């Protein structure tokens, strides 16, 4: 039996709270069960140097975990003087995922930065970050439309993400920490609302997985992402 008596294809309870802080153009607290991430979107009228004069915008992301977001305190990366490899990998994943949902030409020469700060971690922090940041990005874009900066909406569609894996020989969706730490296979899937995939990250932690198991995991991920899209749309009032 899974934690909280969930079915194998059942994600954790998802809660998305918009306008969680008052300063950012977009601000969301996203909760996947006990995993909680604050996602904020900041709009700047500037683009990276390599995009100057190109007539298009940019979407990027940063990711971090609060020192006591886990069972024992972690040292802040700022105190170490550099970001770890895991952090850089995750924030690049978040940024790639969010750029897929935006027509960068229609955004114009401006940049939107999504900051994803993990308040409490219980597995799936990167997938929760992508899910919450997508909503915060929509709010930031809507603020540009409302103030007349943008005439057309550059959002091409929502993006969501979920973890799947094989635990005790069973394919399961949205792994909690205790499942993730014991998984034979661990996979993160990022999808567009139309079903196209942005990223699939899969690793056999124990036994290699078969082609049939891969297809089963991808089907589970699609089911889970579809439920997340419903939560995102409800949060946005769409």
From Swiss-Prot:
Binding annotation for phosphate: 86, 124-126
PROSITE patterns for the chain: RIBONUCLEASE_PH (PS01277)
This protein's UniProt keywords: Nucleotidyltransferase, RNA-binding, rRNA processing, Transferase, tRNA processing, tRNA-binding
Gene3D superfamilies: GHMP Kinase, N-terminal domain
EC number(s) recorded for this UniProt protein: 2.7.7.56
Membrane-spanning segments: none
GO MF annotation, one: 3'-5'-RNA exonuclease activity
GO biological process: rRNA catabolic process; rRNA processing; tRNA processing
Organism superkingdom: Bacteria
UniProt xrefs under PANTHER family: EXOSOME COMPLEX COMPONENT, EXOSOME COMPLEX COMPONENT RRP41
Family: Belongs to the RNase PH family.
Subunit structure of this chain's protein: Homohexameric ring arranged as a trimer of dimers.
Name this protein carries in UniProt: Ribonuclease PH
Organism for this UniProt entry: Haemophilus influenzae (strain PittEE)
């Amino acid at each position: 039996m899974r934690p909280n008596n969930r079915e194998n294809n059942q994600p954790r309870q998802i809660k998305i709270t918009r306008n969680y802080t008052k300063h950012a153009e977009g601000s969301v607290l996203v909760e996947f069960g006990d995993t909680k991430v604050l996602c904020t979107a900041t709009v700047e009228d500037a683009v990276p140097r390599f995009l100057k004069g190109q007539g298009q915008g940019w979407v990027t992301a940063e990711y971090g975990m609060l020192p006591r977001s886990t069972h024992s305190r972690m040292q802040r990366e700022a105190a170490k003087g550099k970001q770890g490899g895991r952090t850089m990998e995750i924030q690049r994943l978040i940024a790639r995922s969010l750029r897929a949902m935006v027509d960068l030409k229609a955004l114009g020469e401006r940049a939107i930065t999504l900051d994803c700060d993990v308040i409490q971690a219980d597995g799936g922090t990167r997938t929760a970050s992508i899910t919450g940041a997508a909503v915060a990005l929509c709010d930031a874009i809507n603020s540009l439309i409302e103030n007349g900066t943008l005439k057309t909406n550059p959002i091409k569609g929502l993006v969501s993400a979920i973890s799947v894996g094989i635990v005790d020989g069973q394919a399961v969706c949205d792994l909690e920490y205790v499942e993730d730490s014991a998984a034979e296979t661990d996979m993160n899937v990022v999808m567009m609302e139309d079903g196209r995939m942005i990223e699939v990250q899969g690793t056999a932690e124990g036994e290699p997985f078969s082609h049939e198991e891969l297809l089963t995991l991808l089907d589970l991920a699609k089911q889970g992402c579809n439920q997340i899209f419903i939560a995102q749309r409800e949060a946005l009032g769409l």
